Amino acid sequence: MDVGADEFEQSLPLLQELVAGADFVGLDIEFTGLRSNLSRPQQISLFDLPSEWYLKTRQSVQQFTICQIGLSMFSSIEGESNKYVAHSCNFFLFPTTFGILDSEFSFQASSVQFLNQYGFDYNKFLKNGIPYMNEEQEKKIKHSILRGNWRVRSSLDKDQIKVVIDKVTQWLDLAEEGDQMTLPGIAGFQAFEVQLVLRQALPNIWTVLKEEWVIVKKVSQPQRWYLEHASCDQVSCWKEQILLSARGFSVFFQMLVKAQKPLVGHNMMMDLLHLHEKFFRPLPESYDQFKQNIHSLFPVLIDTKNVTKDIWKELRFPRVSNLLEVYEVLSSNLNPTKDSGPVIIHARQCKKYAETKCPHEAAYDAFLCGSVLLKVAHLLLQRVHGNGAVHEPAFPQYLDVLAPYVNQVNLIRAGVPKINFSGPDYPSIRPPVLILTVKRWPGVSEQQVYREFQNLCKFDVRRFTRSQFLLLTNKFKDARSVLKEYRNHPTLQVSLYRSWRHSPNITCLLQVCSIVTTWAMIAFLLGRPMP
């Protein structure tokens, strides 16, 4: 089900009901770009601590925006054993351009090309995107609205409002007190802006909104004062309603937060960063503060990438490269619990995905996330209970077996493989760091070293000294392969990095200690009395 700005407000009550009744919610987000082309030191690498990775990625999140959010609400069907219905919705979003708010964001050509390849409709994003704002933006616009201190930022709106003001001013010159005129075809945000600007500019008029037109009435100044302070003028309620419309998807985001349902994604770290930045607050500089904020918003996070990694190793499933392939393996006869697993059906208004595969459409991927979660949880449950597996498992039992994976979110290309949102991060389990010593290759660069090894395996490279480089990979077999391949190389010497042996600081300290010890020994020998 696709939801744009035209349908969003009418859909809110149903959406709230679906979230409240869900056992969990699947999530996927599509962006206008993933990572900005930063200079090499600012690019993420396997050398990064989680806090370093976060600060580098934060810049990209601030540069790009969300074009589509997919949510799939999974609810167990009452009276039916281990059966779930999925309500999957695509939300097309576009940043609020209202009053003082006017966002800037970038497009990345590769991301646009990728989504276009999978049929993404950019017209729905640009023309009918649901507005949204974070709490900081909401405070600014609320302050501006409620105080009546209004500025129009959009050049298009400025031109339209100038025409309206000129029209009303010409009418006022000939109008008598009590006369009124109608401005047709004005509704929504524009109607609000027109009324605020007219009331600010002209002290002898009053405005009333009627469906899709604004009525302007000429009044005396005492009458204007009375209308502004009269209880019958529901301006405050009207302003609150307009603010609600301007908040758009952020209203539903708060409903999602309030519901506190488990949130399920696949490689969901970027999704969480954007949720924080776009709907909650600008991303803080502190990595720990970011973790605390996300945990308070969504106390139960499950990343299916993290869950399936372990299962794939243990059951020796075929290698997969994307979420759809994960889903297909778990839905095939390779899964020993395929026939006893949960039954998942699509809601009546969401039948599209029952017949069509739509990879990289946000709602479809959100549905895949939820389905993979249920299938993997059932597999884990059977392994725990063996042949005496629970006959009619309920979702809380699935959550119990998933407990080791809760709030463990996969991290792509960093010093640790995952982030723990409910406590300290776990130590790295990456392969050991290798050190490359270069002989007879003056002026060699990190890029040249990278190209030297890229045909054998992929390493992140960091200069250590003028003739030494640190190499790091995320695969143990690659580290072993390079150590073996370059064991007797004439110009490139590769070995395991040992801090006590290779660290310049420790080497310097050992040299100083050696010198001090030598001089102490000499002094001792020279100071001994001759026999």
Curated annotation (Swiss-Prot):
GO cellular component: a single term: endoplasmic reticulum membrane
InterPro entries: CAF1_poly(A)_ribonucleases, RNase_CAF1, RNaseH-like_sf, RNaseH_sf
Keyword Zinc: no
Keyword Translocase applies: no
Pfam families assigned: CAF1 (PF04857)
Keywords: Endoplasmic reticulum, Exonuclease, Hydrolase, Magnesium, Membrane, Metal-binding, Nonsense-mediated mRNA decay, Nuclease, RNA-binding, Transmembrane, Transmembrane helix
Enzyme Commission code: 3.1.13.4
Cofactor(s) in the UniProt record: Mg(2+)
Transmembrane regions: 506-526
Molecular-function GO terms, alphabetical: metal ion binding; poly(A)-specific ribonuclease activity; RNA binding
Enzyme class: hydrolase
Induction cue: Down-regulated in differentiated cells, due to methylation of its promoter by the methyltransferase DNMT3B.
Subcellular location: Endoplasmic reticulum membrane
Family: Belongs to the CAF1 family.
Protein name: Poly(A)-specific ribonuclease PNLDC1
Organism: Mus musculus (Mouse)
